[in-house]
Amino acid sequence: MPYLNFAERISQVYLNKYTLALVLVTIKVYLFQKTLVAAVRNIPDFSDCSVDELPTKVSVMIRNMVENNLNSFTYSTLALLHVAAKSILNLIWFAVEMLLGTYTCLFKAAIVGTSDFAADTSEMVVKGLNTTIVEITHDIQSGLDGLSSILNKVVSTASKVADFFTGNNNSDSPDQYQKSISLSLGKLTNLSIPSSVLGEINKIRIDPDFSSVENSTKKLIEEPFTSLTNQWNQNETLSLGGVKFPLLQPLSVCDIGSKSIQELSHNLSTSVEMAAKIVIIILAICAVLVMVPLIYDEWRKWNREERIIGNLVNQNTHYYFDLREAFSNLLHPYLRFLPKSWLSTYVFSNYSISFLLVGLLGLFVVFLQYIILRILIKKAKGTDIDTSQMTKELSNMTSVYLSQIDSYFQKQEDNINDKLFGSVKSTSSKINSTLHEFMSTLNDTVNSIFSNTPFSGPVNTIVYCTIGRKIDKVESGLTWINDNLSVKIPNINKKQLSDNLKSVISESDSSAGSVFAKGVQKTIAMYKSNLFLEFVISISLVGVWVMQLLIGVIIAVTKSHLKRRRLGSLTSSLDKTRISSPKELTKEEKLQYGYGFSVTNPYEVQRYSSKLSGTKIYNT
């Protein structure tokens, strides 16, 4: 940099390749730290929380299964009840008709036989009485006629005697008394049992009619069953009463464990950030410190150039020095300590040294990144998640869910019993009232036939023993049905469900923790793989330089061998003409011969000509 002064040169020292390399290393470490921290912090977001929805999905499946089973149960029960209702109706009517028909036939036979006997006997009695009365009245009439003539004579004589003593000739005629007596006998003559009595007796011959009892009974029995079947037909799409099956809420395992997971993630990322900051600070300090020797070197160069240029200007002589070798290779200050050999020049040339420096820089970056990753590995060991809060929530959630299931089954049980058997219970009550009314009608019919007869008591007893007692039993059975007809839905096994849910939660707990741990391990493994790849690449670059070293050794050995051969051939011809070893030039001589330096900027020579005029050249 011959055109720049010392201050201008110092202003660009920070742009040296060493500082640039350290800055690149710092950037690489920073990017590595950022990506690693981001990966660690994102692990909780990628945790498998799908297990949280598992209980809800299971409860939905249970709900669908329970509702489908309940609907199938209700439909099957409705169909069964339709068949049962028709069967019971026909059986009841068959029993009633059998009992009523049997005893109607018996009643008819008893009534017909009794009425025929009574009618025939009564008719004979009436006819006999009428004949006897007529004969008796004729006999009495004959006697009365004779008595009437005697009495008339007595009356006539008495009347005449009375007239004699009284002298009254206007006395009543005796025929008046005779007429009166004859009239009385005439009424007795017409005396007989009326024929209407025979008509009433003949009415008993007519068969007793129980058809009204049958028709009314059949109508009464069919009415509740018809109403019941109509109601069932309306409930073909029997709903479940609008009661919803309880669903388990999401477990929120990740929400509960998120605090622990976030704390672990924060701790790991903090450790990584701290380690990266330390490394970055060290690299920044190194980047600053590496400029110190460079500044010093620039200062030495500047002083030397000032002295040389001043001496040259003072002599007013232009010397041309070759500075290419001194300034083209910036590693010259370090290489000067190495033996001045061809091999060192070859392997540390600009082409070869680039691969070596980049490879070593890569290894250094890998080493720094591995330090950060190693800190993460150490911190990641023994990462556990506190599941006590999860267990507590599980216990509370399970208790609430089981109570909700109990409430659901109880409501469904009441709903099904009401919709399926509510009408059955009302029908049983109606049948009870129907049977009661039937017995009342039957008793009224029997009483209308046998009332005020000697058969009333026995017939009522027979009716009760044969029909009434059975109807009482039927009424008792219907009452029992009304009190006990219900469906008891079997409840779920609470203990088994609770154990299963706890098993799911424990698996989800371990899943949450294991997923986080696996995420950390996968992240570490991924970055290890990346670091290994960077290590391989860096080693490959160093290997290229090593290969160049081997090539240089081969070339150096070859050249040395050729040189020895040439020297051997020259030795025989120059045995007598030996030249002594050259003497090293002094510094003044080196300046005169232009050894190692060249002045390429006349402007600088003129600039310092007046300043350095008259000065001597100092030894450097």
From Swiss-Prot:
InterPro entries the UniProt entry points to: PRM1
Listed transmembrane segments: 20-40, 87-107, 275-295, 353-373, 535-555
Tagged with keyword Glycoprotein: yes
Signal peptide (residue range): none
Keyword match Cell membrane: yes
Any one GO BP annotation for this protein: plasma membrane fusion involved in cytogamy
Cellular component GO terms held in the UniProt record: mating projection tip; plasma membrane
Protein's membrane topology: Multi-pass membrane protein
Positions in the Cytoplasmic compartment: 41-86, 296-352, 556-620
Main subcellular localisation: membrane
Places the protein is found: Cell membrane
Membrane-side (Extracellular) residue stretches: 1-19, 108-274, 374-534
Keywords per UniProt: Cell membrane, Conjugation, Glycoprotein, Membrane, Transmembrane, Transmembrane helix
Positions annotated with a glycan in the UniProt record: N130, N169, N190, N215, N235, N267, N396, N432, N443, N484
Family: Belongs to the PRM1 family.
Cited PANTHER family: PLASMA MEMBRANE FUSION PROTEIN PRM1
Reported function: Involved in cell fusion during mating by stabilizing the plasma membrane fusion event.
Protein's UniProt name: Plasma membrane fusion protein PRM1
